[in-house]
Amino acid sequence: SDPAGGEFLAEGGGVR
């Protein structure tokens, strides 16, 4: 996932 997406994961990510 993308950090700029919004979703915050332990690995550091984001979903748009």
From Swiss-Prot:
Conversion of fibrinogen to fibrin is triggered by thrombin, which cleaves fibrinopeptides A and B from alpha and beta chains, and thus exposes the N-terminal polymerization sites responsible for the formation of the soft clot. The soft clot is converted into the hard clot by factor XIIIA which catalyzes the epsilon-(gamma-glutamyl)lysine cross-linking between gamma chains (stronger) and between alpha chains (weaker) of different monomers. The keyword Transmembrane does not apply. It comes from the Eukaryota. It is found in: Secreted. One of its GO terms (cellular component) is extracellular region. GO terms for biological process: adaptive immune response; blood coagulation; innate immune response. Keywords: Adaptive immunity, Blood coagulation, Coiled coil, Disulfide bond, Hemostasis, Immunity, Innate immunity, Secreted. Heterohexamer; disulfide linked. Contains 2 sets of 3 non-identical chains (alpha, beta and gamma). The 2 heterotrimers are in head to head conformation with the N-termini in a small central domain. Cleaved by the protease thrombin to yield monomers which, together with fibrinogen beta (FGB) and fibrinogen gamma (FGG), polymerize to form an insoluble fibrin matrix. Fibrin has a major function in hemostasis as one of the primary components of blood clots. In addition, functions during the early stages of wound repair to stabilize the lesion and guide cell migration during re-epithelialization. Was originally thought to be essential for platelet aggregation, based on in vitro studies using anticoagulated blood. A long coiled coil structure formed by 3 polypeptide chains connects the central nodule to the C-terminal domains (distal nodules). The long C-terminal ends of the alpha chains fold back, contributing a fourth strand to the coiled coil structure. This is Fibrinogen alpha chain. It comes from Odocoileus hemionus. The gene is FGA.
